[in-house]
Regions:
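Donor nucleotide-sugar binding/catalytic pocket of nucleotide-sugar-dependent glycosyltransferases
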Residues: 138-188
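A charged, aromatic-enriched C-terminal amphipathic alpha-helix characteristic of glycosyltransferases
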Residues: 72, 329-366
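Active-site proximal beta-strand in glycosyltransferases
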Residues: 87-88, 104-127
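N-terminal subdomain of nucleotide-sugar transferases
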Residues: 1-49, 84, 220-221
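Conserved catalytic-core segment of nucleotide-activated headgroup transferases in glycan assembly
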Residues: 12, 178-242, 249-264
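Acidic donor-binding loop of glycosyltransferase active sites
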Residues: 263-278, 289-291
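Short hydrophobic beta-strand element within catalytic cores of glycosyltransferases
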Residues: 282-288, 292-296
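Membrane-proximal helix-turn-helix segments that form the acceptor-binding/catalytic region
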Residues: 15, 75-82, 116-120, 128-157
Length: 366
């Protein structure tokens, strides 16, 4: 479910819908709903929206297919897709089971590769302290590595970062095309207000983000700085740590506008990650909507966005950069610099590339 678009994993999907719609593309959107509810906002950009439940978790654990794939096997999905002879864009490897089951009617098929999935799950296993979850992530990584060969059977793969383009191009050939991540391009930053706290936002149901949040708690817990950790999900482990420190609080995100208000009032956005996978959508989103950004190597290396961020890797470096930036006001010139560099990540230009590739496939994939 890509709305509200308030964490990295759904930002690319939602703003891709908006961009394609703005260019006149009719979209029949198929979405698995598990907790976020049906969203009327999607009707603004889609001709029709179909909702499906995920399958039994217990049965899916026992499958030779990856859990994230097997839980999305759905007969109604295949029936609805086969009503039309339109090209199909699968959002992530995990949505591709209709291809694996060989139940499509010959439609052109394309996959948006959000990550090198088996590497992503290996990283989750390394970040996970729970033994059961760690073993699950390891097994899922192995299954995903085997399952990835399904990309041999699709007409095109749209990669999300230059590094991952190299990987997919080497394995699956010229049908792999780099399409920069989709994101919100509206500048929300209120330049007249100097922010008064430090913000970290992310989906803390994901162990990688929990690890990043714990790192930040440990970094700022004995400082004079106010840290806000924002997520639409409440993590018990983080809640226990946060309550110990008066200068750190949790903000439960209620919607996209809620996150925008935090961006407007935060002076610094801190974005550490411990996985060098894909491009972090939260980085792009923050550069458009937030003020200063401090990020580590894993977050910004080889993104083309290095010059727009302050780099810090250790706790000491984060604290030093924080002190420096809190003494500065956010100059409007910074926004203009960002706009120039972020033009390379224009959602409209990326949407045009997708349309061009799909509509003139033979010319582009030779």
């Amino acid at each position: 479910m890509p709305y509200p678009a308030n964490y990295g994993g759904v930002i690319d999907v939602f703003y891709k819908l908006k961009a394609l719609h703005s260019l006149g593309i009719e979209i029949y959107f198929h979405v698995f709903e598990y907790g976020r509810g049906e969203q009327k906002e999607l009707n603004k950009y889609c001709k029709e929206v179909f909702y499906y439940p995920r399958n039994s978790f217990i049965k899916s654990f026992l499958s030779v297919d990856p859990f994230i794939v097997k839980t999305r096997a759905n007969d109604d999905l295949i029936k609805n897709i086969n009503k039309y002879d339109f090209p199909i864009l699968f959002e992530g490897l995990h949505t591709t089971i209709p291809i694996q089951l060989e139940k499509l009617n010959g439609q052109k098929t394309y996959v948006r590769a959000h990550n090198i999935e088996h590497n992503f799950y290996k990283g989750l296993a390394k970040s996970e302290s729970n033994v059961f979850k760690r073993n699950f992530f390891k097994q899922e990584a192995e299954k995903l590595k085997r399952y990835e060969k399904i990309l041999l059977n699709v007409d095109g793969v749209f990669t999300i970062s230059p590094n991952e383009q190299k990987y997919f191009r080497k394995k699956y050939g010229v049908k792999c095309k780099y399409i920069p991540a989709f994101h919100d391009t509206e500048i929300h930053t209120n330049l007249e207000v100097k922010g008064n706290f430090i913000l970290y936002h992310g989906n803390v149901s994901v162990s990688e983000n929990v690890k990043a949040a714990l790192f930040l708690i440990d970094t700022y817990k004995d400082s004079i700085y106010q840290l806000v950790i924002a997520s639409s999900y409440v993590n018990d482990q983080l809640a226990i740590e946060i309550v110990k420190h008066k200068n750190i609080r949790f903000h439960s995100l209620q919607g996209e506008d809620d996150l925008n208000r935090l961006f407007e009032n935060a002076h610094i956005n801190v974005l550490p990650t411990f996985q060098n996978t894909g491009i972090k959508l939260k980085l792009l989103n923050t550069l458009y909507q937030g003020k200063f950004v401090i990020a580590n190597d894993f977050m910004i290396d080889d993104t083309g966005l290095e010059s727009l961020c302050e780099k810090a890797n250790t706790k000491e470096e984060f604290l030093t950069k924080t002190k420096e930036l809190l003494d500065k006001t956010f100059d409007p010139k910074i926004v203009e610099t960002r706009k120039k560099i972020l033009h390379n990540f224009s959602p409209i230009e990326s949407a045009k590339k997708i349309i061009d590739i799909i509509l003139t496939r033979d010319r582009h994939l030779k």
